[in-house]
A protein has these predicted regions:
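Conserved catalytic-core segment of nucleotide-activated headgroup transferases in glycan assembly
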Residues: 1-59, 173, 180
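Short, solvent-exposed polar/charged micro-motifs at secondary-structure junctions
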Residues: 29-30, 57-63, 128-134
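Short acidic alpha-helix that forms the nucleotide-activated donor recognition element
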Residues: 55-69, 89
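Catalytic binding pocket for nucleotide-activated donors in carbohydrate/polymer assembly enzymes
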Residues: 71, 75-160
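C-terminal alpha-helical cap of glycosyltransferases
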Residues: 159-182
């Protein structure tokens, strides 16, 4: 389950912690349930709630939240596409587990569309290794954080028009019609 995956990551990265509460949708009751799950692993003290919520909209992430985390880990089941897209746009790498069911693959699909296939893990073991590897190289992570937002401006996820134009041209060719040059 998700807590087991995250607990294993915490065990392999002693400096890491989990910060929940990217949106106001995570209230104190939900946070208590999350923290309780990690108590079984002896890791409850490394689970924190983002305390600086300036927004009340359940879907808006406080921009300061993105400065407080190094990576966003999507374990599949409860993927929030808006938060995943926000994370990438704000320069935070999203490491995603490609699940079995279509809904469990939503985060992975967004990460692929953001031109980051190396951030998608096929198995839970792959996700754990990927996360530990990325968190272990502070220099590379810092560089990624500095350049990711600018790179996302060109990614299909945030810039779909060139792809749509390409598909339109392919359809026109299939129909035997003239393809515009612009």
């Amino acid at each position: 389950d998700e807590a087991e995956i995250l607990a294993e990551i915490l065990n392999k990265t002693p400096q890491a912690r989990i910060i929940v509460g990217a949106t106001p949708a995570v209230d104190l009751e939900a946070f208590s349930r999350i923290k309780y799950q990690f108590k079984a692993f002896g890791l409850a003290d490394r689970v924190e709630m983002s305390s600086d919520q300036k927004y009340t909209d359940q879907m808006i992430v406080d921009p300061d939240y993105w400065n407080s985390i190094d990576v966003f880990i999507d374990v599949g089941r409860r993927a929030n596409p808006t938060v995943i897209a926000d994370s990438l746009w704000m320069g935070v790498p999203v490491l995603s587990l490609k699940g079995e069911r279509p809904f469990d693959r939503l985060g992975a699909s967004l990460v692929y569309t953001a031109a980051r296939p190396g951030w998608v893990a096929e198995t839970r073991e792959d996700l754990i290794k990927l996360t530990v590897d990325i968190l272990s190289d502070a220099g590379a992570l810092s560089k990624t954080r500095k350049t990711l937002r600018n790179e996302m401006r060109q990614a299909l996820l945030f810039n779909p028009e060139p792809h749509v134009r390409s598909v339109e041209r392919a359809y026109l060719r299939l129909l035997g019609r003239e393809v515009p040059t612009s």
